[in-house]
UniProtKB/Swiss-Prot annotation:
Encoding gene, per UniProt annotation: rimP
Gene Ontology terms describing biological process: ribosomal small subunit assembly; translation
Protein name in UniProt: Ribosome maturation factor RimP
Keywords carried by this UniProt record: Cytoplasm, Ribosome biogenesis
Highest taxon above the source species: Bacteria
Gene3D superfamilies: Ribosome maturation factor RimP, C-terminal domain, RimP-like superfamily, N-terminal
Pfam families, per database record: DUF150_C, RimP_N
Subcellular location(s) of the protein: Cytoplasm
Classification of source organism: Bacteria, Pseudomonadati, Pseudomonadota, Alphaproteobacteria, Rickettsiales
Gene Ontology cellular component annotations, sorted alphabetically: cytosol
SUPFAM superfamilies hit by this protein: YhbC-like, C-terminal domain, YhbC-like, N-terminal domain
Function (record text): Required for maturation of 30S ribosomal subunits.
Primary location: cytoplasm
Keyword Cytoplasm belongs to the record: yes
Family according to the record: Belongs to the RimP family.
Organism: Rickettsia rickettsii (strain Sheila Smith)
């Protein structure tokens, strides 16, 4: 059985893609009322504006009203995934090659559960990281969560835009 987050993903992802957005994450916060938080990113590597979030929110709201997946009252929050966005799909690692990432694992690998390094490559369900002077191979299924890291290099590129 799919979680409510997976069901929401299934009904909104295609519409967001058609609008030029990647659906990054669907998450519930709070209790009464529930808050449905949806993080989006641009498919063409442009910044996500407030107007983009508003358009996406209207589309998502209409779909959720029709699909009626959420029984109780809720608030909808649509936001940019941000500079230190989560990497939740295997494909994300290829999109962000050469970027710094923090990874938390579900279990120990070489005596550690946390790694930070540059993504060298991602293939065959494996992530290759350059951590300091060594290369670390991480099985994608071991990853609990991962986020991009805002480095000085990335920050300088943003200032030039």
């Amino acid at each position: 059985m799919q979680t409510i987050e997976q069901q929401i993903t299934n009904v909104i992802e295609e519409s967001l893609t058609d609008m030029g957005f990647e659906l990054v994450l669907v998450k519930f916060k709070g209790v009464n009322p529930k808050v449905v938080e949806i993080l989006i990113d641009s498919l063409n590597s442009e910044k996500v504006s407030v107007e983009d979030c508003t358009k996406a929110s209207r589309t998502i709201s209409a779909i959720l009203d029709v699909e009626d997946l959420i029984e109780a009252a809720y608030s909808l929050e649509v936001a940019s995934s941000g500079l230190e966005r989560p990497l939740v799909k295997f494909e994300n690692y290829n999109r962000f090659l050469e970027r710094e990432v923090k990874i938390k694992l579900k279990e120990l690998l070489n005596g550690k559960t946390r790694y930070q390094g540059k993504i060298i490559k991602a293939e065959n369900n494996k992530i290759y990281l350059k951590c300091e002077e060594q290369e670390v191979l991480i099985d994608y299924d071991l990853i609990k969560n991962a986020n991009l890291v805002l480095t000085e290099e990335v920050f300088k590129k943003l200032l030039k835009q």
